[in-house]
Amino acid sequence: MFSQITRPVRTFIDQFSNINQGIAAGERIFSIIDAQSEIQDKPGAIELDGLKDKIEFRDIHFSYDGSREVIEGISFEIKRGETVALVGPSGGGKSTLSELIPRFYDVKAGDILIDGVSVRDYTQDSLRAHMSVVAQDTVLFNDTIEGNIAMGKAGATHDEIVEAARIANADCFIQEAPEGYQTNIGDRGVKLSGGQRQRLSIARAVLKNPEIPVSYTHLRAHETEAD
């Protein structure tokens, strides 16, 4: 009789603990979702309708802490169709410059202009819709290979995903995976190597086919045969 009571009670206690953990986790998640970004669209911000001429960095100054500048008076321009590489030592501000274009941060002085208009005059949604970012730290989800690549373009077909993977030199290792494109890669892509994760990130960017592609120093994690 006693054992018949203790078993369901123990089960109830275990489930109650799980519920409390779930509530605590939910509160943290919603606090992040509800957080307001410091960077907001200005009143009357306009839509970016594609890159027609050039991106101009005009006397850019930037500081993370408001005091020591990590970028001091940088000026250059990138014309439509050009590929520009920023080369320099670690900590030199290359990634920071890349993060200023989609307004992950705002410049402290100077300006970034797209077709003669400050990026701060465009809506963030329209600005980022014309961009892709292959970051140093690849963001992948506990989903299939195809599902992760497909996040680059809503409604992408399987053929489009395969072609993007081929261009990113990812198709070769995907074909060798246990279930091909339907292989689950685990949380944050834990089942893949660093180079494979970054090739999926590149494939996602290729699938989006943006007018303004931005790529950080992603080759550092590539295997030799993929370089």
Question: Which role does the model predict for each range below?
Answer:
Residues 34, 41-42, 48-215, 219-220:
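ABC-type nucleotide-binding domain
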